[in-house]
Amino acid sequence: MARNRSSRTKKRKKLNIDRGVVHIKSTFNNTIITLSDLDGNTILWASGGTVGYSGSKKSTPYAAQLAADKIAKEALKLGLTRVSIEVKGPGAGREAAIRTIQAAGLVVDSIKDITPIPHNGCRPRRRRRV
């Protein structure tokens, strides 16, 4: 007989932290936003795909805005008040995500751009011709 399986959701622990780090990785195809504690342990994450978009719509600033809003609301539920933001990548969703986190009521301590810049390393992709 087939067993009725419950959905695979974990019970979220109440965290006793008031500060965190929001990592925004913005690529040309998607924007991934991760909330971690000060040690770097992931608490929660969201992306353009998890908020319901697929394909080229994931890379839009609006998808990044929805993902950042989801992260900010969950962070406020968990009791976080202050965050520092680390941004990585050249994508379109960077500014929209930062503005949304600030507007949601989280106090932003610092904004750091940690985009890796090569000192003439690997050969880059070919230039797009549209």
UniProtKB/Swiss-Prot annotation:
The gene is rpsK. GO terms for molecular function: rRNA binding; structural constituent of ribosome. SUPFAM superfamilies: Translational machinery components. Located on the platform of the 30S subunit, it bridges several disparate RNA helices of the 16S rRNA. Forms part of the Shine-Dalgarno cleft in the 70S ribosome. Keywords: Ribonucleoprotein, Ribosomal protein, RNA-binding, rRNA-binding. Part of the 30S ribosomal subunit. Interacts with proteins S7 and S18. Binds to IF-3. The lineage of its organism: Bacteria, Thermotogati, Thermotogota, Thermotogae, Kosmotogales. Belongs to the universal ribosomal protein uS11 family. GO terms for cellular component: ribonucleoprotein complex; ribosome. This is Small ribosomal subunit protein uS11. It comes from the Bacteria. GO terms for biological process: translation. Pfam families: Ribosomal_S11.
